[in-house]
Amino acid sequence: WNRLPGTTTIHLPFELLDSPLPGTTMAHSKENFSGSSSLEGKNGMFVTKLMERELKNFTPDFVARKSVFCFENRMICLGTGIHNSNNEYPTETTLFQSTFQKGKSTILVNGEEEKEIGFKKKLSGTTEKLLSIRDGYNNHYFVKDGNVQIQITKQESRHEKTRAVTQGTFASAWIEHGKAPKNGTYEYLVWIQPTDQELKNYEATQTYEVLQRNDSAHIVHDRLT
């Protein structure tokens, strides 16, 4: 429940995840800047200013500015101004979390195949050296800014309604911002099930250019469209 792909969250233990509002899990933010648009059904964007409510188990000074620019089967994900005072639990941005079947599923980390339950590694992505990950569904992630934790492990959760213990094996990757981050950032590209020819023809860094990435604006130029 902590790691929904694309979200920036404080990783809380299960007992702190329930909504403090009776009858609903929708804790609406006081921040109203959020929206999306599309062009010809092929290109689009989403942007939001994250701001937590002042509620039980929430961190009211948790803020972030997030955007996703979509060009055909590529998504450029940017984050700036990630800030909160929660020094007990870490803040993270999830790349993916997907079910993993031993003997059937594999992931790639910088071109190396990983298929063993218990795999765990921490790597960094930079402008000079992108971190490349492929999930079990042939989606490719290229991290340009961020320290990334990757793992294949058995996880325990709870059924949403009955609270019965549930278990499963998952492959996960997330960008670590640490506890109580100050002006945290991230940048990564998600290439959705690219063909071998697409990967051969273009390097991830060649497909787009970030013109601006700060608290004033997120601006991206896509070179292929």
What are these regions (language model features)?
Residues 181-192:
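Short Pro-Gly-centered flexible turn/kink motifs
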Residues 50-53, 81-83, 147, 154-156, ...:
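Secondary-structure transition/turn motif
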Residues 191-225:
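Non-catalytic terminal regions with compositionally biased, polar/charged low complexity
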Residues 113-174:
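Trp/Gly-enriched beta-strand surface patches
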Residues 1-112:
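Catalytic and substrate-binding regions of extracellular carbohydrate-active enzymes
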Residues 46-48, 131-133, 171-176, 218-222:
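Generic recognition of long tandem-repeat/solenoid scaffolds
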Residues 53-59, 163-166, 175-181:
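Extracellular beta-rich ligand/substrate-recognition surface
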Residues 32-39, 68-69, 122-124, 131-132, ...:
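Short, exposed beta-strand/loop patches in secreted or surface proteins that constitute
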